């Protein structure tokens, strides 16, 4: 389907706007995927907060110009789509890694975070990063542990005294423990 000049400019503006807000980007080859598989992938991407778009490579290059994902331009060859993570750096990587296991024809080419390109072999490291909520909960657990230990240490002498008094009371009552 050919696009007129106004439609092409609109696509470039849309992708540029999303790319300027994105945290990471993944480029993948979708050759061999069926329409149903692509529809399922797009649906999951929407749920995950990932912007997934199939755009002509020349338009994608123009859209990524002057963004931190300009480094992906050399990889925009053949039928590829771009997935942009808007909430967490690992969202798009995790989504496409899971789908690459299910649909073997999906080939992840590269990932870009912070202006650096990582190849498909390194995507596992980014995909395994915790989400923001998971990271906050782990941090809170680590911060809470020393305080809990301190509170237990402060409470132990009182608890020991209470147990000793209970044992003395039971012994005087004739019920040896």
Swiss-Prot record:
Provide the assembly information. Answer: Part of the ribosomal stalk of the 50S ribosomal subunit. The N-terminus interacts with L11 and the large rRNA to form the base of the stalk. The C-terminus forms an elongated spine to which L12 dimers bind in a sequential fashion forming a multimeric L10(L12)X complex.
Q: Which GO terms describe its molecular function?
A: large ribosomal subunit rRNA binding; structural constituent of ribosome
Task: List the protein's name.
Answer: Large ribosomal subunit protein uL10
Q: Which domain of life is it from?
A: Bacteria
Q: Please, one GO biological process term?
A: translation
Main function: Forms part of the ribosomal stalk, playing a central role in the interaction of the ribosome with GTP-bound translation factors.
Query: Is the keyword Repeat in the record?
Result: no
Originating species: Legionella pneumophila (strain Corby)
The residues forming a coiled coil are: none
Key words, A-Z:
Ribonucleoprotein, Ribosomal protein, RNA-binding, rRNA-binding
